[in-house]
UniProtKB/Swiss-Prot annotation:
Stretches with biased composition (Basic and acidic residues): 118-135
GO CC terms: cytosolic large ribosomal subunit
UniProt protein name: Large ribosomal subunit protein eL24
Biological processes annotated in GO: cytoplasmic translation
Region spans: Disordered: 118-156
Keywords: Ribonucleoprotein, Ribosomal protein
Pfam families, A to Z: Ribosomal_L24e (PF01246)
Length: 186
């Protein structure tokens, strides 16, 4: 039969079922103490790291070295196990490991070159589209004045700003949008 033991929140000692003192703080955090001595020291706000008989002190001052060394030995005896990564099998990984660095560098450079060419191609396409759009706007806009072109530029102020453009039109700014309105009053 296995007994579920808990640890004292102050001293770090084992507490067996039916033993210990349970303290529940107002923020509903539960503390379990081994005895009234641990409870009293906790409430008096003594630091367990300064009391020589607590587990925290022993750990900080390396008193239980023999037990920790055994645990460390157990941890380090794990055998390395090579697993395949998602998207690549073990054979592919082994093949890549064994291939020469020159071949690997050449493949990397080729991949980088391809990516750069693709980026350059997309930039050129965007420039061509932009040029077409500006040409079409210029050809359409020769007869009429563009919306934003007729307004004189003044100092940029926050909030609402009224500005007279001509004898019968007024523009007001809200943020960065300019809205034209013809006025009834002059």
């Amino acid at each position: 039969m296995v007994l579920k033991t808990e640890l004292c929140r102050f001293s770090g000692a084992k507490i067996y079922p039916g033993k210990g003192i349970r303290f529940i703080r107002s923020d509903s955090q539960v503390f379990l103490f081994a005895n009234s001595k641990c409870k009293r020291y906790f409430h008096n706000r003594l630091k367990p790291s300064k009391l020589t008989w607590t587990a925290m002190y022993r750990k900080q001052h390396k008193k239980d070295i023999a037990q920790e060394a055994v645990k460390k030995r157990r941890r380090t005896t794990k055998k390395p196990y090579s697993r395949s990564i998602v998207g690549a099998t073990l054979e592919v990984i082994q093949k890549r490991r064994t291939e020469k660095p020159e071949v690997r560098d050449a493949a990397r450079e080729a991949a980088l070159r391809e990516i750069k060419e693709r980026i350059k191609k997309t930039k050129d396409e965007k420039k061509a589209k932009k040029a077409e759009v500006t040409k079409s706007q210029k050809s359409q806009g020769k007869g009429s004045i563009a919306k934003g072109g007729a307004q004189p530029k003044g100092p940029k102020l926050g909030g609402w700003r009224w500005q007279a453009l001509s004898h019968c039109s007024v523009a007001y700014l809200l943020g960065s949008r300019v809205i034209d309105r013809t006025c009834l009053f002059v």
